[in-house]
């Protein structure tokens, strides 16, 4: 009689699971960060879609005046949003089990917290997953460093700013018009357009767009001819080919003569590092600016800075912006305040520039 011994396969289930999770041969890399990223992002997306379509109105200001944000309550794609949780909740963690009923949870904007917390964990894990895959493949880690800019921006508007202001009702709504409302109120309360870190962010985003267009057009204009006039130039490139597909010397010569010699990169590596670093650093600064303005360290105030010899104010664009800020502030949350804080606490401000008397 022959006796055979068979090793139990269950002893290696964990090892095979680990190998599958960390395998770079999968069509889509999962990784250990992906183990947390996938369920959190799926939860955030599912709750966002359901809330955007069907969530009942939310008492965002905590004054029993609900704001409707979902499609089924009369909104469209532009006006719809997942409305932030109620000011009555403040900074309290508000999961479903903390509410007395599902209706109460919906009325107080519980879905907003569910979405942003899962979303922030998910995008942080996506950043970690980028590093993890780079590590497995022996690549340098700069991809995740670049992605840290949008992660920092999202963290600033969804987490840091509400913490600084004392309530998640001050977080950015999850919708198009809600985002615009957030921007307008942010300008009214913090004068973000006059903050140097926001200016750096504008330079980063607009400059990055300009440099991207310049680089793409230069490369496309200096391709090595591999096709005839009747063929698409895209057929002149084969994936993985060793030869350069464009002439960097020609591109450098063109741009150096168009502007001046040292305005043009002669090193492809430093050029592409610059293209990545410029917008990333700009967005880092904007996220840092929002995080400081969260605690009311606001933009520059040049209101009524110029006066004549008689002490009369000579209006500047700073005064025009200040007047616009006051108008936006008095109009937002108009039923939540008896009197706007800036107007109640500050000096008397004229509502119009002094006009000269009319003789006639």
UniProtKB/Swiss-Prot annotation:
Cofactor note: The D1/D2 heterodimer binds P680, chlorophylls that are the primary electron donor of PSII, and subsequent electron acceptors. It shares a non-heme iron and each subunit binds pheophytin, quinone, additional chlorophylls, carotenoids and lipids. D1 provides most of the ligands for the Mn4-Ca-O5 cluster of the oxygen-evolving complex (OEC). There is also a Cl(-1) ion associated with D1 and D2, which is required for oxygen evolution. The PSII complex binds additional chlorophylls, carotenoids and specific lipids.
Membrane topology qualifier: Multi-pass membrane protein
Enzyme Commission identifier(s): 1.10.3.9
Site label Stabilizes free radical intermediate, positions: 190
CC annotations in GO: photosystem II; plasma membrane-derived thylakoid membrane
Principal EC category: oxidoreductase
Pfam family, one: Photo_RC
Disulfide bonds: none
Record site feature (Cleavage), residues: 344-345
Location of the protein in the cell: Cellular thylakoid membrane
Site residues (Tyrosine radical intermediate), renumbered to this chain: 161
Prodomain residues: 345-360
Keywords: Calcium, Chlorophyll, Chromophore, Electron transport, Herbicide resistance, Iron, Magnesium, Manganese, Membrane, Metal-binding, Oxidoreductase, Photosynthesis, Photosystem II, Thylakoid, Transmembrane, Transmembrane helix, Transport
Binding site for Fe cation: 215, 272
Residues annotated as binding a quinone: 215, 264-265
Residues holding chlorophyll a ChlzD1: 118
GO biological process: photosynthetic electron transport in photosystem II; response to herbicide
Spans traversing the lipid bilayer: 29-46, 118-133, 142-156, 197-218, 274-288
Binding positions (chlorophyll a PD1): 198
PTM statement from Swiss-Prot or TrEMBL: Tyr-161 forms a radical intermediate that is referred to as redox-active TyrZ, YZ or Y-Z.
Miscellaneous comment as given in the Swiss-Prot or TrEMBL entry: Cyanobacteria usually contain more than 2 copies of the psbA gene. 2 of the reaction center chlorophylls (ChlD1 and ChlD2) are entirely coordinated by water.
Main function: Photosystem II (PSII) is a light-driven water:plastoquinone oxidoreductase that uses light energy to abstract electrons from H(2)O, generating O(2) and a proton gradient subsequently used for ATP formation. It consists of a core antenna complex that captures photons, and an electron transfer chain that converts photonic excitation into a charge separation. The D1/D2 (PsbA/PsbD) reaction center heterodimer binds P680, the primary electron donor of PSII as well as several subsequent electron acceptors.
HAMAP family documented for this protein: PSII_PsbA_D1
Protein name, entry field: Photosystem II protein D1
Organism field: Trichormus azollae (Anabaena azollae)
Gene name of this polypeptide: psbA
